Amino acid sequence: MREIVHIQAGQCGNQIGTKFWEVISDEHGIDPAGGYVGDSALQLERINVYYNESSSQKYVPRAVLVDLEPGTMDSVRSGPFGQLFRPDNFIFGQTGAGNNWAKGHYTEGAELVDSVLDVVRKECEHCDCLQGFQLTHSLGGGTGSGMGTLLISKIREEYPDRIMNTFSVMPSPKVSDTVVEPYNATLSVHQLVENTDETYCIDNEALYDICFRTLKLTTPTYGDLNHLVSATMSGVTTSLRFPGQLNADLRKLAVNMVPFPRLHFFMPGFAPLTARGSQQYRALTVPELTQQMFDAKNMMAACDPRHGRYLTVATVFRGPMSMKEVDEQMLAIQNKNSSYFVEWIPNNVKVAVCDIPPRGLKMASTFIGNSTAIQELFKRISEQFSAMFRRKAFLHWFTGEGMDEMEFTEAESNMNDLVSEYQQYQEATANDGEEAFEDDEEEINE
């Protein structure tokens, strides 16, 4: 019932994805060989959301692993959970995309995409009632961004009524891995705006800050960063996998979180995050979780929610707790910080409560915010994009793969439109709307 097919593309996507499967397997009591070693019937009750049970009682992830070079795949296969995945579901090319979006989207990736879709189709046929897809990828590289967005649009064609959910690692403001990141990211956002239902914006820099400031890790590794991401990913789908007092699924989240179809870029957060040494000094209570969850330092995207306003928020609480207390806290935070919530969506916090906490915690919570402050992230990418595009720097790598400059111009203006849409709704009030919105509709229709 309600299965989710997971796809990971590119190096970043595969590393986050693999970490995610470690976390999920741990929650469901699945060992690295796919056997069940858990201790509670609840772990197996809805295990088929993410796992397929083979004839030999082995649980196999509904995961498709995609990359244009064999390197990352090999390290996944030789990693601790490498034997968990179905060998046929590793699909890789030999050439690599070389951080080039055009290679991932038009040339190398396009050659591989049909064999990926075959595997995706096979996974979907094993499903009883497919809920949707989740993709992990980064927007800075070539494969995750170029081929990832190609996969999204192909899957969208074939399964138009299923939810498409992406966990996208955005380029960071200060840390840049590749020079052409702004190009790749802008071209990807151009696709994500049209083709996904929910996109969780994750940012390495924000994750570094959390590891450094909050978790007090002096030298955070990618493993630590990916662990944070996978905690959030596990939180988002927790009510599909475990019974709860108030359930949410991907579609409910989308319906409650997306007021306008293009504005589906969310900031995730997770609580409790405490340094290893100071854990025993903190009481885990609902107020404490709520406090930390709405804290700007806790956001996994490098945007400050205090610079914008929340259109909508979803929170998933995990662990034994009283619903009444959760509701009171949510009401309190909306009343106390009412200026940070748009007033034209009255009750804009969606709550889900699940009874089973993550491993090793008494209670935890996941935060998903649709805030207009996310425009900072797009503005940043857009400025870097314009600076390079004005001089046509590095363009020959993309045009050489058959792309047209026009496509860059379109992507740029689409991203700028997105920024101004966020800005427009940030400034909108409950009663000024009548004339203002009529003008906007005309503009959009042109």
From Swiss-Prot:
It comes from the Eukaryota. Some glutamate residues at the C-terminus are polyglycylated, resulting in polyglycine chains on the gamma-carboxyl group. Glycylation is mainly limited to tubulin incorporated into axonemes (cilia and flagella) whereas glutamylation is prevalent in neuronal cells, centrioles, axonemes, and the mitotic spindle. Both modifications can coexist on the same protein on adjacent residues, and lowering polyglycylation levels increases polyglutamylation, and reciprocally. The precise function of polyglycylation is still unclear. GTP binds at Q11, E69, S138, G142, T143, G144, N204, N226. GO terms for biological process: microtubule cytoskeleton organization; mitotic cell cycle. Mg(2+) binds at E69. The MREI motif is common among all beta-tubulin isoforms and may be critical for tubulin autoregulation. Tubulin is the major constituent of microtubules, a cylinder consisting of laterally associated linear protofilaments composed of alpha- and beta-tubulin heterodimers. Microtubules grow by the addition of GTP-tubulin dimers to the microtubule end, where a stabilizing cap forms. Below the cap, tubulin dimers are in GDP-bound state, owing to GTPase activity of alpha-tubulin. This is Tubulin beta-5 chain. It comes from Gallus gallus (Chicken). The lineage of its organism: Eukaryota, Metazoa, Chordata, Craniata, Vertebrata.
